C-alpha cells in the first residue's frame, strides 16, 4: 500500500526518517507530497536523500514544474524530474476555484525535460498502477 505523506510546509520534521522507516517496516510505502515546495528542502535539497535512499516515492506538483510556485520550487522540481526521482506528477487541487486540477502546463514542461513518454507515465500509467494495487 502507498500512503501520501505531507510534511509541514516549513520544514521536514525532526526524525521523520524514523517515521517513514516505521511505515516501510509495516508494508506501507510513503509517497512524499510536493517535496519541492517544502521550505526545508528548498534550503537544503539534500534533506530528501534519506527518504529516497529508504525507497520513498515522490509526488511533485505540476504547477511547480511550470513555475507556479516560484523559481525555487520550479528548480527543485526540474532537478527531481531530470534525476528520475519523481513517481507521480499531480495537481494538488484542494479547491476547484482556488487551485483547480490542471496538469497541462506542468506536463508540457516535464515532457520537455524528460520526454513525452516518461512525462505521460507520471500522470497516467504510474498512478493507475498504484490505484490498482489498492483496489484489486
Regions found by a protein language model. Give the residues of each.
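Structural recognition of alpha->loop->beta junctions
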Residues: 50-58, 76-90
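Mid-to-C-terminal alpha-helical segments outside catalytic/metal-binding sites
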Residues: 103-136
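Conserved, mostly hydrophobic/aromatic
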Residues: 34, 92, 127
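Extended substrate/RNA-proximal surfaces in nucleic-acid metabolism proteins
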Residues: 1-59
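Active-site environment of divalent metal-dependent phosphoester hydrolases
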Residues: 37-41, 65-68, 94-99
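Short acidic/histidine-rich active-site segments
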Residues: 85-101
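Charged helix-capping and loop-helix junction motifs
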Residues: 17-20, 43-49, 71-81, 103-106
